[in-house]
Amino acid sequence: MRRYLFAGFLPALASLSAPLCAAEGTTGAAAPTVGAASGAAAQLAQLVLGLGLVIGLIFLLAWLVRRVQQAGPRGNRLIRTLASQPLGPRDRLVLVQVGEEQILLGLTPGRITPLHVLKEPVHLPDGEPATPEFAQRLLELLNKDPKGKP
């Protein structure tokens, strides 16, 4: 409701200020006065200060988010994702290890379904992560040549 009230107030304010601006133009003042120049400088300084404050706040919040994400336990995790295989745009199979047990899960947008509990654990090579990081995928995409050079 307030937004609509404010939106109706702006055109009325603009219509009131138009005759005032026209009256100033008829006085014949060719050069701006010192007060107008200092007012413009003050407005510019306020604009730059506000913009700097908002940008600083964005950087501070980004730094805090990184610190909070790193604070979580990293070492001895009980639940780990071992492998993931996409089946479609939103469906995938995920192999999860919970303690000593490995479970194959089916993930859809609305459900997580346990499909199979493996009796013998699957051993994956240690050097390769289950899902590549974003940076690795980006490098792979950048190194691909779209023209198909041999």
From Swiss-Prot:
<dbReference type="GO" id="GO:0097588">
    <property type="term" value="P:archaeal or bacterial-type flagellum-dependent cell motility"/>
</dbReference>
<dbReference type="GO" id="GO:0009425">
    <property type="term" value="C:bacterial-type flagellum basal body"/>
</dbReference>
<dbReference type="InterPro" id="IPR022781">
    <property type="entry name" value="Flagellar_biosynth_FliO"/>
</dbReference>
<dbReference type="InterPro" id="IPR052205">
    <property type="entry name" value="FliO/MopB"/>
</dbReference>
<keyword id="KW-0145">Chemotaxis</keyword>
<keyword id="KW-1133">Transmembrane helix</keyword>
<dbReference type="Pfam" id="PF04347">
    <property type="entry name" value="FliO"/>
</dbReference>
<keyword id="KW-1003">Cell membrane</keyword>
<dbReference type="GO" id="GO:0005886">
    <property type="term" value="C:plasma membrane"/>
</dbReference>
<comment type="similarity">
    <text>Belongs to the FliO/MopB family.</text>
</comment>
<keyword id="KW-0472">Membrane</keyword>
<dbReference type="GO" id="GO:0006935">
    <property type="term" value="P:chemotaxis"/>
</dbReference>
<keyword id="KW-0812">Transmembrane</keyword>
<keyword id="KW-0975">Bacterial flagellum</keyword>
<feature type="transmembrane region" description="Helical">
    <location>
        <begin position="45"/>
        <end position="65"/>
    </location>
</feature>
<protein>
    <recommendedName>
        <fullName>Flagellar protein FliO</fullName>
    </recommendedName>
</protein>
<keyword id="KW-0283">Flagellar rotation</keyword>
<feature type="transmembrane region" description="Helical">
    <location>
        <begin position="5"/>
        <end position="25"/>
    </location>
</feature>
<comment type="function">
    <text>Involved in flagellar biosynthesis and adherence. May have a role in assisting the proper localization of the various flagellar components and in the localization and assembly of the adhesin on the bacterial surface.</text>
</comment>
<dbReference type="GO" id="GO:0044781">
    <property type="term" value="P:bacterial-type flagellum organization"/>
</dbReference>
